[in-house]
């Protein structure tokens, strides 16, 4: 098996020396390919992301990703162990001297996209996952970071303990809320199905609220099993949003009338509100979605406010929802802007910034820092300058969790002194709940659900059961016809659509399921229409290619992968849509 893994590594161009063995394909990140491997030194399974540094632009994006992931340390964020160069060498702050970089990170069993492909989650599972997603977003946003690519494929799940972790920060961006970043933000990064209306209208001007819109779309998808707004292109995406999300503010109405008047109803009434679009979702969840999926980002809940909503009350615990103690500042964003300008000339110009580069690459989460050197969360008691700047819509400086931080003499000292098992109000209504908590490293994860974890006790047996014939889902029919200008486009797209598109790489093994049946009653897995990865075929063809490396054309890997996956007619449309989302 080790020889097969080494062959796979050579086929994909992985050169990490002999430390990592048993490579297996996992998928593709935004900036590179991802393989699983076994770290023989640490004796653990890891995921290794390869980033090719082919030019100044790719190097700039790699530096930004490494800078961000090295500083983020949270239970609901995929942990990064180290960043290596060719042959497993240490980068030592000299990224610009290498042609490739490897990010060694925590291995996660599956992702949310794979789980959703197997069927609708129970509401209990959806609520638990949404809580952890907001818990991770609260920390990310407090660090002045935008993820910018939240979608089920970038949300990873451990089916053993139901822990959710946010991953793939290849498109993440540092944004200091006290300064205007207008003109320096990239266009259209979020996958269009999870793209907010503000991002569709003004792709260069957005805030942390774009992540919250994506989170709301993901919650609706978990509750219903299908994408909330599955537009074939940006025009249809905006049309679907306007059919469901009300436009309240006058400035938004004026902009829509100026930009796309044919798509706007004269009465500004929505055709299918969320309560009608999602008839099987309970009223409390609908209220939660209505507060997240607002047309204007100023009216949208923040991650911290979402954690305090009644829908999250079974898990809400402000004392166990930490924020970043070392957020990124405007200086970090300026470094990126300077590097962007420097990359336009030549790579050697980057030698002018060795300090900022090496400090970001050599930072460790456990590094000791003096309290005076740590910048507090800028949202806690800070007052923005009264200048003409873009104001972040997080107008919640007096929220309960921030008052908790301000009243404590030190948030770090409070974290060490607090006994979470006794001081936290878990609001679960069960006197024995604390006795069932999942403990790790002498502290509980208060959001762990023993009952839901028990529901997974038979997923391995169910995964080995013979699959039943899959029943193709009928496409969702529309009740109303689109606007006149949109009709021709919709008719053209209709011929290529066979259902809701989903952009996710094909699995290479049977994926674990979240069983909805009680413990002791495993649920058989329904056979899906997703393509299956044949490892034996892949290995045999890979060995043939390895014997003739000089004859390997650039597109040979695509032919190899295609030969190992069974084709389905519907996959062609999905593949085309998925490739367009990776721009």
From Swiss-Prot:
It is an enzyme of class 2 (transferase). GO terms for molecular function: ATP binding; MAP kinase activity; protein heterodimerization activity; protein homodimerization activity; protein kinase binding; protein serine kinase activity. It is found in: Cytoplasm; Nucleus. Its EC number is 2.7.11.24. A motif (SEG motif) lies at residues 186-188. ATP binds at residues 26-34, 49. A motif (FRIEDE motif) lies at residues 328-333. Changing residue 168 to A: Kinase defective mutant, abolishes activity. Its cofactor is Mg(2+). Phosphorylated at Ser-186 by PAK1, PAK2 and PAK3 resulting in catalytic activation. Phosphorylated by MAPKAPK5 at other sites. Keywords: ATP-binding, Cell cycle, Cytoplasm, Kinase, Nucleotide-binding, Nucleus, Phosphoprotein, Serine/threonine-protein kinase, Transferase. One of its GO terms (cellular component) is cytoplasm. Activated by phosphorylation at Ser-186. Atypical MAPK protein. Phosphorylates microtubule-associated protein 2 (MAP2) and MAPKAPK5. The precise role of the complex formed with MAPKAPK5 is still unclear, but the complex follows a complex set of phosphorylation events: upon interaction with atypical MAPKAPK5, ERK4/MAPK4 is phosphorylated at Ser-186 and then mediates phosphorylation and activation of MAPKAPK5, which in turn phosphorylates ERK4/MAPK4. May promote entry in the cell cycle. The FRIEDE motif is required for docking MAPKAPK5. Belongs to the protein kinase superfamily. CMGC Ser/Thr protein kinase family. MAP kinase subfamily. Homodimer. Heterodimer with ERK3/MAPK6. Interacts with (via FRIEDE motif) MAPKAPK5. This is Mitogen-activated protein kinase 4. The lineage of its organism: Eukaryota, Metazoa, Chordata, Craniata, Vertebrata.
């Amino acid at each position: 098996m080790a020889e097969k893994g080494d062959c796979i590594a050579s086929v994909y161009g992985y050169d990490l020396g002999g430390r990592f063995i048993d490579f297996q394909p996992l998928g593709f990140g935004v900036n590179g390919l991802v393989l699983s491997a076994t770290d023989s030194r640490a004796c653990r399974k890891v995921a290794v992301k390869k980033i090719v540094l082919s030019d100044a632009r790719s190097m700039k994006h790699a530096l930004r990703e490494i800078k961000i992931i090295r500083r983020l340390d949270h239970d609901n964020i995929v942990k990064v162990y180290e960043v290596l160069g060719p042959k497993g060498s240490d980068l030592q702050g000299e990224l610009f001297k290498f042609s490739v970089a490897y990010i060694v990170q925590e291995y996660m069993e599956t992702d949310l996209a794979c789980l959703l492909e197997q069927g609708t989650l129970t509401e209990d599972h959806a609520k638990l996952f949404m809580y952890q997603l907001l818990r991770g977003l609260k920390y990310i946003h407090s660090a002045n970071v935008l993820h910018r690519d939240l979608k089920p494929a970038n949300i990873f799940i451990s089916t053993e303990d139901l822990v959710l972790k946010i991953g793939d920060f290849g498109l993440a961006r540092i944004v200091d809320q006290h300064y205007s970043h207008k003109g320096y933000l990239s266009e259209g990064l979020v996958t269009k199905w999870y793209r907010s209306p503000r991002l569709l209208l003004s792709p260069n001007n957005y805030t942390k609220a774009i992540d919250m819109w994506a989170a709301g779309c993901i919650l609706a998808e978990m509750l219903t099993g299908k994408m909330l707004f599955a537009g074939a292109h940006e025009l249809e995406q905006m049309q679907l949003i306007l059919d469901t999300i009300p436009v309240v503010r006058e400035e938004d109405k004026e902009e829509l009338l100026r930009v796309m008047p044919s798509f706007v109803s004269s009465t500004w009434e929505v055709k299918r509100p969320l309560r009608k679009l999602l008839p099987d979702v309970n009223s409390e969840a609908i209220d939660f979605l209505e507060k997240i999926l607002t047309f204007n980002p100023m009216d949208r809940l923040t991650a911290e406010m979402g954690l305090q909503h009644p829908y999250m009350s079974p898990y809400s615990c402000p004392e166990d929802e930490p924020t970043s103690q070392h957020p990124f500042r405007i200086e970090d964003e300026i470094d990126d802007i300077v590097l962007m300008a420097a990359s336009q000339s030549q790579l050697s110009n980057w030698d002018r910034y060795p300090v900022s580069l090496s400090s970001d690459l050599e930072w460790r989460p456990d590094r000791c820092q003096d309290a005076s050197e740590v910048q507090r969360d800028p949202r806690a008691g800070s007052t923005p300058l009264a200048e003409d700047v873009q104001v972040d819509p997080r107008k919640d400086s007096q929220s309960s969790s921030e008052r908790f931080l301000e009243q404590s003499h030190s948030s770090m000292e409070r974290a060490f002194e607090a006994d979470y098992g006794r001081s936290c109000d878990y609001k679960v209504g069960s006197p024995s709940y604390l006795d069932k908590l999942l403990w790790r490293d002498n502290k509980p994860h208060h959001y762990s659900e023993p009952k839901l974890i028990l529901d997974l006790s038979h997923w391995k047996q169910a995964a080995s059961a013979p699959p039943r014939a899959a029943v193709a889902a009928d496409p969702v029919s529309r009740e109303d016809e689109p606007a006149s200008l949109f009709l021709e486009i919709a008719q053209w797209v209709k011929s290529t659509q066979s259902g809701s598109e989903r952009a996710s790489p094909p699995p290479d093994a049977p994926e674990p399921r979240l069983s909805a049946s009680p413990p002791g009653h495993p649920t058989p897995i329904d056979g899906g229409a997703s393509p299956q990865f044949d490892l034996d075929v892949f290995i045999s063809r890979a060995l043939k290619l390895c014997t003739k490396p000089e004859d390997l054309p650039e597109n040979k890997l695509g032919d190899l992968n295609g030969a190992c996956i069974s084709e389905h007619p519907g996959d062609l449309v999905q593949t085309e849509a998925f490739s367009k989302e990776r721009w």
